Amino acid sequence: MARQPTKKSGSKKQKRNVPSGMAYIQSTFNNSIVTITDQNGDVISWASAGSSGFKGAKKGTPFAAQTAAESAARRAIDQGMRQIEVMVSGPGAGRETAIRALQGAGLEITLIRDITPIPHNGCRPPKRRRV
């Protein structure tokens, strides 16, 4: 007789009450990723343009970044999040719309900081496109 499959006892997602935290918006030309953490840096919720249902070139659009930010904010508000500090990184199109979407979802933004890394003449950039 075959053995009955035993239920794995993995770590269950518990509901925490986190009133304030940080939101990291990584916006590249191809995608936008929004991660919301508590003050210690432990991830509470995240969403990307790809996880929000966009594929291909549509992932780099401002609307995709807005949808991802709304999705991440909704899950963070369910955990009790009220105030966030926003860290924006990258050159993508969805930077401003993601910040507006976080504000529109009901989160109070206390600080906006641009943490895009800028090289002091580091690696050679890719060659220019000729279309």
From Swiss-Prot:
Transmembrane segments: none annotated. Pfam families: Ribosomal_S11 (PF00411). InterPro entries: Ribosomal_uS11 (IPR001971), Ribosomal_uS11_bac-type (IPR019981), Ribosomal_uS11_CS (IPR018102), Ribosomal_uS11_sf (IPR036967). One of its GO terms (cellular component) is ribonucleoprotein complex. GO terms for molecular function: rRNA binding; structural constituent of ribosome. Keywords: Ribonucleoprotein, Ribosomal protein, RNA-binding, rRNA-binding. It comes from the Bacteria. Residues 1-20 are annotated as: Disordered. The keyword RNA-binding applies. The keyword RNA-binding applies. GO terms for biological process: translation. Residues 1-16 have a biased composition (Basic residues). Belongs to the universal ribosomal protein uS11 family. Part of the 30S ribosomal subunit. Interacts with proteins S7 and S18. Binds to IF-3. Located on the platform of the 30S subunit, it bridges several disparate RNA helices of the 16S rRNA. Forms part of the Shine-Dalgarno cleft in the 70S ribosome. This is Small ribosomal subunit protein uS11. It comes from Nostoc punctiforme (strain ATCC 29133 / PCC 73102).
